[in-house]
Amino acid sequence: MSFLSPAVGPAAALLPLSLHPEPSSLVIVAGGGRDLAWPMPLIARELVAQAHGRPVHLLLHGGARGADQAIALAADQLGWPAAALPADWRRFGRGAGPIRNRQLLEQAIRHAQSHSTPHSAVGVLVVAFPGGAGTASLLQLSRQRVLSSPVPLLVVEVAPSLGSALAPA
C-alpha cells in the first residue's frame, strides 16, 4: 500500500522509506496554518483518506485557530480521540511553535510505542495541511526523524490545491 495520495506534494515522494513494517493502526499528528479556511468536512475527508482504513488511536494537534480547530472538529466528527498541545508563547516566545511541534511528535511516538506489540505495529502519521512557518517546522522535524523513529513514521504534505479540488460544486 502506498502512503502517497494525490494530495501529497512532489517533495514527499523523495522521502526515505521507513525501516519499519507497515503500521496496522495509527497515531496522527495533524497541523496547518491559522489562516486555513477549509471546511471541516474537507479536513475530515483528507484525514480519513490518509489513514487508509487503519484505526486511529489518537489525533494530536496544536490547538491553534484555523487548521487546528477544523482538525479537532473533524476528529470529533469521526469519533477519533483527540488532544491539543498548545504552544506556550509566554514561556518560550518565538521558539514556542517549534518546541510544541517537537513535543507533538515525541508524544505521538511515545503513544504509538505504548500501543505497539510484536505482532502489530502502531505508526505515527504526520498530516500537514497548508500553512506557514509553523507547519514547515513540523514537516522539517518529522522528515528528519523518519529514519531514527522507533516506530513507523509517515509524513504527508497536503497540497494547497486540494482545498479547491475537494470543495463541493
Regions found by a protein language model. Give the residues of each.
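Acidic/glycine-enriched connector segments
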Residues: F3-V29, R34-P168
